[in-house]
Swiss-Prot record:
It is an enzyme of class 4 (lyase). Homohexamer. Keywords: Lyase, Magnesium, Metal-binding. It catalyses: 2-dehydro-3-deoxy-L-rhamnonate = (S)-lactaldehyde + pyruvate. Substrate binds at Q151, A178, D179. Disulfide bonds: none annotated. Its cofactor is Mg(2+). One of its GO terms (cellular component) is cytoplasm. Belongs to the HpcH/HpaI aldolase family. KDR aldolase subfamily. Catalyzes the reversible retro-aldol cleavage of 2-keto-3-deoxy-L-rhamnonate (KDR) to pyruvate and lactaldehyde. This is 2-keto-3-deoxy-L-rhamnonate aldolase. Binds 1 Mg(2+) ion per subunit.
Length: 267
């Protein structure tokens, strides 16, 4: 395989290694590069809740490329046309939100594969992914380097988890705590004991099926708990939340009546 197509993030998942990540919601290549120099194993570049365009995602991929931190792109949804664009700009690992059924999971897999294995549109000669046609036999090699992660974040998805885990081409399943807790009737309360129980059992089911299990935890104790349950790709913070907390803490040192960071929700 061409060295440009190697995917260290996927290789480490296959080995069952734990990888610690950071969520990037700031939408700038400058902030992405700062994060990449910190040494996180992976960086989630968010196109679902952060206002990133395809060009924004592209520039952030360029910014982190020289560093060891591995980029993961989350598009706003899992449509075939959007997945095609994100792959063409050079993303190798995708996190697809709101996957509720095995059929949805199969459609997402198909969108990432070239024919005859899927429906990805052919345009590598004009795309960064193939270095504008300079990677020989790109189409024959790329499937092995792509890593596909799907988010389970609703009661419906939980009911269908075993079927989703059976879909060939899914490398890992990410538990979305904020949407999941809301779907279960505990909005903005991912720490509720029932939600915690479901998160634990889901992580254990994912790992038992031979897939990687992922999670985002903005509280360090929750991140440690998920790691103890077996999650092996865990994001331990969000750049914008860490930035705003740091600003509040610094201001509190010099302004009377300021008590440090305000509560900003579970995500």
């Amino acid at each position: 395989m061409n060295a440009l197509l190697t995917n260290p993030f996927k290789e480490r998942l296959r080995k069952g290694e734990v990888q610690i990540g950071l969520w990037l919601s700031s939408t700038t290549s400058y902030m992405a590069e700062i994060a990449a120099t910190s040494g996180y194993d992976w960086l989630l570049i968010d196109g679902e809740h952060a206002p990133n365009t395809i060009q924004d995602l592209y520039h952030q991929l360029q910014a982190v490329a020289p560093y060891a931190s591995q980029p993961v792109i989350r598009p706003v949804e899992g449509s075939k046309s959007l997945i095609k664009q994100v792959l063409d700009i050079g993303a190798q690992t995708l996190l697809i939100p709101m996957v509720d059924t095995a059929d949805q999971a199969r459609q997402v897999v198909s969108a990432t594969r070239y024919p005859p294995y899927g429906e990805r549109g052919v345009g590598a000669s004009v795309a960064r992914a193939a270095r504008w046609g300079r990677i020989e036999n790109y189409m024959a090699q790329v499937n092995d380097s792509l890593c596909l992660l799907v988010q389970v974040e609703s009661k419906t998805a939980l009911d269908n988890l075993d079927e989703i885990l059976d879909v060939e081409g899914i490398d890992g399943v990410f538990i979305g705590p904020a949407d999941l807790s809301a779907s279960l009737g505990y909005p903005d309360n991912a720490g509720h004991p029932e939600v915690q129980r479901i998160i634990e059992t889901s992580i254990r089911r994912i790992r038992a099926a031979g897939k990687a299990a992922g999670f985002l935890a903005v509280a360090p104790d929750m991140a440690q708990q998920c790691l103890a349950w077996g999650a092996n790709f865990v994001a331990v913070g969000v750049d914008t939340m860490l930035y705003s907390d740091a600003l509040d803490q610094r201001l509190a040192m010099f302004k009377s009546g300021k008590n440090g960071p305000r509560i900003k929700g579970s995500y």
